[in-house]
Curated annotation (Swiss-Prot):
UniProt cross-references to InterPro entries, sorted A to Z: Chordopox_A20R (IPR010267)
Lineage: Viruses, Varidnaviria, Bamfordvirae, Nucleocytoviricota, Pokkesviricetes
GO BP, sorted A to Z: DNA replication; viral DNA genome replication
Domain of life of the organism encoding this protein: Viruses
Primary role: Plays an essential role in viral DNA replication by acting as the polymerase processivity factor together with protein OPG116. Serves as a bridge which links the DNA polymerase OPG071 and the uracil DNA glycosylase.
Name this polypeptide is given: DNA polymerase processivity factor component OPG148
Organism expressing this protein natively: Vaccinia virus (strain Copenhagen) (VACV)
Pfam families xref list: Chordopox_A20R
Family per record: Belongs to the orthopoxvirus OPG148 family.
Subunit note: Interacts with the DNA polymerase catalytic subunit OPG071. Interacts with UDG/OPG116. Component of the uracil-DNA glycosylase(UDG)-OPG148-polymerase complex; OPG148 and UDG form a heterodimeric processivity factor that associates with OPG071 to form the processive polymerase holoenzyme. Interacts with OPG117.
Gene giving rise to this polypeptide: OPG148
Amino acid sequence: MTSSADLTNLKELLSLYKSLRFSDSAAIEKYNSLVEWGTSTYWKIGVQKVANVETSISDYYDEVKNKPFNIDPGYYIFLPVYFGSVFIYSKGKNMVELGSGNSFQIPDDMRSACNKVLDSDNGIDFLRFVLLNNRWIMEDAISKYQSPVNIFKLASEYGLNIPKYLEIEIEEDTLFDDELYSIIERSFDDKFPKISISYIKLGELRRQVVDFFKFSFMYIESIKVDRIGDNIFIPSVITKSGKKILVKDVDHLIRSKVREHTFVKVKKKNTFSILYDYDGNGTETRGEVIKRIIDTIGRDYYVNGKYFSKVGSAGLKQLTNKLDINECATVDELVDEINKSGTVKRKIKNQSAFDLSRECLGYPEADFITLVNNMRFKIENCKVVNFNIENTNCLNNPSIETIYRNFNQFVSIFNVVTDVKKRLFE
């Protein structure tokens, strides 16, 4: 029988296999180790180890330099490397997250702008973007024929956010140390946090990356959320001294297995610290971590893509959309609106609150039932006041994991439907 840990490994192997074309060396190494594990465990798994892939970003970036070094004379372009989730937009014309291989939906105007940039130069291999706090910025543009600066200028004309950059001529051998690093970093005077610096020498394609940092451990006092947009909240990790550790998104929080009132490993930069996610940080399974973090954040929030959103009015909007009636701000307005339509009223009467709420959110029925069968509910006055997942192994199914991460919203809609039924028919 396949164990929970085996299923997690196989799921990660499949995800990495799908994203090999956009993998860096660390992801390829992880993929090969999982292929080796899978072959020894199951004899034949249908995929093979790889040495090279058609488009690996490691082809364009040298190994990171984390100690002072001498930089040769020449003309250079320096670029910031931003903190956040890294995405690649290529000739396939879709935004793919580096490492996970997950496709990401972007606004139509952004997609159109990216396509125009790609179509302007047949030599562009890909555009590199960073997503942080629900904001996109182009970080790099890889072209065989021209400097990224030219592509940045064009991208800016099409409305894309572009990085600050610095063009310098270095006339003699120069020590690239912490002082020079800080001077260059300060010249990038935008608000995005920068984790390192990359540079390109004129006439060369490969980027050199400089990252001066120190590892440290910090005590976590609390895990909260910060508002970054219209009902969009990003996880926030607070230390005992009140300092904030930077977190990319919900998945970053999960991978790091961060827990309140424990120490976590961080990368310390000059002005901020970054939550460091690495294998071996505790023995919890992914499902156990997801359950704990959702419990920590509380029942007022649900996972919405990479971030959290607050339950409430969003559920009412989805319910009115499902019923094809006018939007309502309160349950009273919803009841009045339903009373205007005999068809809608009959639908509410004949369909269970359970099924209507599930359909409203578009959950697959079989996966939803599997999740519910692994949960225990506390019901008062026909409403769900609390729930607990008793077996997190079912979260190894990605679809079930997504439903569970969103389950607080289901409960909110279910309770609204229950309230509406009571007012209409009792």
